[in-house]
From Swiss-Prot:
Full protein name: NADH-quinone oxidoreductase subunit K
Organism: Ralstonia nicotianae (strain ATCC BAA-1114 / GMI1000) (Ralstonia solanacearum)
Primary localization: membrane
Chain segments annotated as transmembrane: 4-24, 30-50, 61-81
Role: NDH-1 shuttles electrons from NADH, via FMN and iron-sulfur (Fe-S) centers, to quinones in the respiratory chain. The immediate electron acceptor for the enzyme in this species is believed to be ubiquinone. Couples the redox reaction to proton translocation (for every two electrons transferred, four hydrogen ions are translocated across the cytoplasmic membrane), and thus conserves the redox energy in a proton gradient.
Record's subcellular location: Cell inner membrane
GO cellular component annotations of the record: NADH dehydrogenase complex; plasma membrane
Protein's GO biological process: ATP synthesis coupled electron transport
Length: 101
C-alpha cells in the first residue's frame, strides 16, 4: 500500500515539473496556462493525501473549491487568449506588451 510520503513526493515532482515548465517556456501562453493548471493539480493531490491520512474530509471539500476556481480560471484565460489571437494574430507572450483601450 502506498503511504503518505509516496503521494507527497509525487505531488512535489508534479509541482517541480510545472515550475520548470513555466521557467523554460515563457513564450507560449497555452503552455503557461497548462503549467499553472498542473501546479494546481499537484497542490490538490497533496490536499487529498493529507485529508485521507488525517481522516478529515475538509481537505477533499477544499479541493472541489480549488477545482471550480481552476476551471473558471482556465476558461477565462482561454477566452482572453482567443481574443488576443484574433486581434494580434499571435499567442507569443513577448508580443502582448501593448495596452490599448
Amino acid at each position: 500500500m502506498l503511504s503518505l510520503a509516496h503521494y507527497l513526493v509525487l505531488g512535489a515532482v508534479l509541482f517541480a515539473i510545472s515550475i520548470v515548465g513555466i521557467f523554460l517556456n515563457r513564450k507560449n501562453v497555452i503552455v503557461l496556462l497548462m503549467a499553472i493548471e498542473l501546479m494546481l493539480l499537484a497542490v490538490n493531490m497533496n490536499f487529498v493525501a493529507f485529508s485521507h491520512y488525517l481522516g478529515d474530509l475538509a481537505g477533499q471539500v477544499f479541493v472541489f473549491f480549488i477545482l471550480t476556481v481552476a476551471a473558471a480560471e482556465s476558461a477565462i484565460g482561454l477566452a482572453i487568449l482567443v481574443v488576443l489571437f484574433r486581434n494580434l494574430d499571435t499567442i507569443n507572450v513577448d508580443d502582448l506588451d501593448s495596452l490599448k483601450g
